Amino acid sequence: MRTLPVGVDQRSTIRHPDFLGADDLSVKIEELRIATNYQVPIFIKMGATRPRFDVAVAAKAGADVVVVDGAEGGTGASPELLLNHTGIPTMSAIRAARESLDECGMTGKVSLVAAGGIRTGVDAAKCLALGADAVMIGNGAMIAAGCNSPRYEEDYAKLGTAPGACHHCHTGLCPVGIATQDPELQKRMNPHAGAERVARYLTAMTMEITALAKACGKSSVHNLEVEDLRAMSFEASAFTGVKMAGIDKPFEW
C-alpha cells in the first residue's frame, strides 16, 4: 500500500476500531461534533447490506446524513472478489433506507444520500424518485477529471492493464497522475483542466435531472417520487417495489 514497506502486512480491520455498536457510534459522533465545534454536519457512509437496520442505527445514533453505497460502487483499492460479490444494488437499497427513516421518525431530520454506480442524470433522477435526498458521485467525477485516459497506453501496459480497466489507485502508479504521490506522475494531471471537465459533467447531469423532472410535471427535482417510475422488468420491480409497466402494481413473488 504505497509507502508501506514490502513484507509488512496492511492492517485492515473487519470493523471500525472506534466503535462496536450503536452506543459506541453515538459517542463517536458526539466526539466528532466537539472536535469540529458543532460547525459541520456528520456523515455516516455505509455499504448497502442491511439498509433497513443499518440506516436506523445511524440515524438514531445522531448522524446528520446517512450515505448508502450500493454494490455498483467502484473503488481502485478493493479486491475484485469484494467488488463483484458483496453488497446489494443501489436502487434496491434506497427504498429500504427511506422506509427505515420513515419508520423511526427521522425523515426530515436525517438526510439520505445514495451512492454507488451513479454515472448520469438518469441514474440520479431515479435515486431521487426512490427516496434519496441527494446523490454522491465518485468514479464518474474521476473519469471526467481524466481517470483511465488512453493517453499513456505504454504505462498501462507496464502495469499489466489497459485504459478503462486500470484498478491501480492503491499502487500509487496512476498513469494519469490522479491517484498518486509520485511528483513526476502528478505533473501529468492538469487540475484546472480537470476541474473544468468535472464542472461540465456535473452541469450536464443537472440538466438531465431537471429535464426528467419537468417531463414528470414537477417544478423541482426534489418533487420526484416513486409514482413517477415504472419498472421494465420483474426483477427491477421486485428489487425496488416500483410498479410494473403495463399492470400498474409491484411484482410480488
Residues covered by each model-derived region:
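Glycine-rich phosphate/pyrophosphate-binding loop
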Residues: 1, 13-16, 245-249
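Flexible glycine-/small-residue-enriched beta->alpha junction loops
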Residues: 1-7
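Glycine-rich phosphate/ribose-binding loops and adjacent secondary-structure elements
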Residues: 11-186
